[in-house]
Design a protein with these regions (language model features):
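An acidic/polar, Gly/Ser/Thr-rich interaction patch typically located in mid-to-C-terminal regions
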Residues: 37-66, 225-379
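Solvent-exposed coil/turn segments that connect beta secondary-structure elements
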Residues: 14, 47-51, 80-82, 92-99, ...
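Residues forming anionic-ligand binding surfaces in small-molecule and nucleic-acid pockets
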Residues: 111-126, 146-155
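Short beta-strand-centered interaction patches in the first periplasmic/extracellular domains
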Residues: 106-111, 115, 154-229
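Assembly/oligomerization scaffold segments
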Residues: 1-120
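Well-ordered beta-strand positions in beta-sheet-rich domains
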Residues: 29, 87-92, 110, 127, ...
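Short acidic/polar beta-strand-loop edge motifs in secreted extracellular
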Residues: 120-141, 156-183, 317, 377
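Short, solvent-exposed secondary-structure boundary/capping segments
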Residues: 97-113, 201, 353-366
């Protein structure tokens, strides 16, 4: 990519291997997106012509990925910045696009893929029972199937656990592993995603609440002359986003529904702003009356977490000027934006674009209030 940044590309089934120099020379652009919600993805664009050896290489590679008996083609991207190698993406190939060259101009082959959660979405396991297993145990058991891909499960118990009693009910899976795990996450207000680990060829399958605590990344500086390290940064505040969900728990004796307001109680999502967004309206969740109390409260927490982030920001930066790779699903500081918008933010998504001579990132930030709760943020 440049003299200060080195990109390594590994491709292969299950355990990928470094690609030949022919592929690296033909690689024009890399785009990688990590987001706090949904699957992450990548796109690789190669420059080719009709006589290029790359056509044969891709035919062989894709031909090995055409049935359930063969594993998906795995793609790993590793970035070395400042002498430190860190995995940028670990996923599988899902689509190959070819654009033919015209007027003596070279064509291109575009490889598109998703993170390793895609391998959990290939086979339907509907009907598989999980007797007497809490949700986090079910998630750990499901993720254990994919240890060959280097996936390490990290399930966090629900704030209000609901352990099924076998003589009353036995939970059964519906759909693929990925669909079922996401359904479980939705029920208890958790998120599920797979992201590259600290060591190449390993990934963390995280099932739990969004973590908005921990050491923040170096600050994004705006309008600070020589200390400015972002190309652009824009903010917005939506005062109507605050919603207080109200769940209904049925009294087993009288059958009368009891309304209970549910604030955002997640200890891993403390306020990042001193002035929280006002409660704009109430959301009556009447469907929760048919659930048991633990399930109803978990459904309320799931709804409460969606309506807290009234402050958002978007921007872009040059990685060489920033000095490191900005990571999604982490905290980051902001300086120079004014009293209302300075402070800590949660990085909800990052799109990294690499080409020869450049490495840029565009990002989205969120926060649940105005005015910083800390007098200083790490530089």
């Amino acid at each position: 990519v440049s003299s200060a940044i080195h990109l390594s590309l590994l491709i292969g089934p299950i355990v990928p291997i470094p690609v030949p120099a022919l592929l690296i020379d033909a690689l024009e652009e890399v785009s990688v997106t990590h987001a706090s919600e949904g699957a992450s993805g990548f796109q690789l664009r190669f420059k080719v012509n009709s006589h290029s050896e790359l056509n044969t290489l891709f035919l062989i590679a894709v031909g090995n990925n055409t049935s359930l008996g063969t594993p998906p083609l795995r793609v790993v991207l590793i970035v070395t910045l400042g002498g430190r190698a860190q995995p940028l993406f670990d996923g599988v190939l899902t689509h190959v696009g070819v654009q033919a060259g015209q007027d003596r101009q070279a064509g291109s082959i575009t490889l598109t893929g998703e993170d390793l959660s895609k391998v959990m979405d290939l086979i339907d396991f509907s009907g598989l029972p999980y007797p007497a297993m809490p949700i986090e145990a079910r998630v750990a058991l499901i993720c254990a199937k994919y240890a060959a891909f280097g996936i390490i499960p990290l399930p966090i118990p629900a704030l209000f656990p609901d352990v099924p009693i076998p003589i009353e009910r036995i939970p059964a899976q519906q759909g693929t592993d990925l669909a079922y795990v996401r359904q479980l996450a939705e029920e208890v207000g958790h998120v599920f995603y797979i992201e590259p680990g600290e060591v190449p060829l390993t990934s963390i399958a995280y099932f739990g609440p969004e973590i908005k605590v921990g050491p923040p990344q170096p600050a994004l500086n705006v309008d600070m002359d020589a200390h400015t390290n972002v190309e652009s940064l824009n903010f917005s505040f939506d005062p109507t986003k605050g919603v207080l969900p109200v769940v209904y728990i049925q009294n087993p004796q009288t059958r009368a529904p009891i309304p209970i307001p549910i604030p955002n109680l997640n200890p891993l999502q403390p306020p990042l702003g001193a002035l929280s967004a006002p409660i704009a309206n109430l959301k009556m969740m009447k469907d929760t009356a048919k659930l048991n109390p633990m399930q109803a409260i978990s459904a309320g927490l799931a709804e409460a977490k969606k309506s807290q982030d009234a402050v958002s920001a978007s921007g872009s930066l040059d990685v060489l000027r920033y000095g490191r790779v900005l990571r999604a699903r982490r905290l980051v500081g902001v300086r120079g934006a004014g009293v209302a918008y300075d402070g800590l933010y949660y990085v909800s998504s990052v799109t990294s674009t690499l080409a020869r001579g450049k490495f840029t990132q565009s990002f989205q930030l969120t926060r649940n209030g105005l005015v910083s709760i800390t007098p200083r943020v790490p530089a």
